[in-house]
Amino acid sequence: GKFSVFSKILRSIAKVFKGVGKVRKQFKTASDLDKNQ
Protein backbone atom coordinates (compact mmCIF):
# COMPACT_ATOMS: atom_id res chain seq x y z
CA GLY A 1 0.00 0.00 0.00
CA LYS A 2 1.07 3.56 0.74
CA PHE A 3 3.78 2.45 3.16
CA SER A 4 5.64 0.37 0.56
CA VAL A 5 5.72 3.36 -1.79
CA PHE A 6 6.99 5.55 1.04
CA SER A 7 9.74 3.06 1.94
CA LYS A 8 10.75 2.81 -1.73
CA ILE A 9 11.11 6.60 -1.89
CA LEU A 10 13.13 6.64 1.35
CA ARG A 11 15.37 3.89 0.03
CA SER A 12 16.06 5.74 -3.22
CA ILE A 13 16.83 8.93 -1.29
CA ALA A 14 19.22 6.98 0.96
CA LYS A 15 20.91 5.57 -2.16
CA VAL A 16 21.37 9.08 -3.55
CA PHE A 17 22.85 10.31 -0.27
CA LYS A 18 25.23 7.33 -0.15
CA GLY A 19 26.34 8.05 -3.71
CA VAL A 20 26.88 11.73 -2.93
CA GLY A 21 28.89 10.80 0.17
CA LYS A 22 31.13 8.50 -1.87
CA VAL A 23 31.71 11.16 -4.53
CA ARG A 24 32.48 13.82 -1.92
CA LYS A 25 34.95 11.48 -0.20
CA GLN A 26 36.75 10.82 -3.48
CA PHE A 27 36.72 14.54 -4.26
CA LYS A 28 38.20 15.36 -0.85
CA THR A 29 41.01 12.79 -1.15
CA ALA A 30 41.78 14.06 -4.65
CA SER A 31 42.06 17.67 -3.46
CA ASP A 32 44.20 16.54 -0.51
CA LEU A 33 46.54 14.79 -2.95
CA ASP A 34 46.74 17.99 -5.01
CA LYS A 35 47.72 19.96 -1.90
CA ASN A 36 50.44 17.47 -0.92
CA GLN A 37 52.14 17.53 -4.31
Swiss-Prot record:
Q: What's an example of a GO molecular-function annotation for this chain?
A: toxin activity
| Tissue and organ expression note | Expressed by the venom gland.
Which InterPro entries does the entry link to? Antimicrobial_3
Which superkingdom is the protein from? Eukaryota
What Gene Ontology cellular component terms go with this record?
extracellular region
Coiled-coil ranges from the UniProt annotation: none
Keyword check for Transmembrane, yes or no.
no
Report the family membership: Belongs to the cationic peptide 02 (oxyopinin-2) family.
Function in brief: Disrupts biological membranes, particularly those rich in phosphocholine. Has antimicrobial activity against Gram-negative bacterium E.coli, Gram-positive bacteria B.subtilis and S.aureus, and hemolytic activity against sheep, pig and guinea pig red blood cells. Has insecticidal activity against S.frugiperda ovarian cells by opening non-selective ion channels. Enhances the insecticidal activity of spider venom neurotoxic peptides.
Q: What is this protein called?
A: M-oxotoxin-Ot2d
User: What organism does the record attribute this protein to?
Assistant: Oxyopes takobius (Lynx spider)
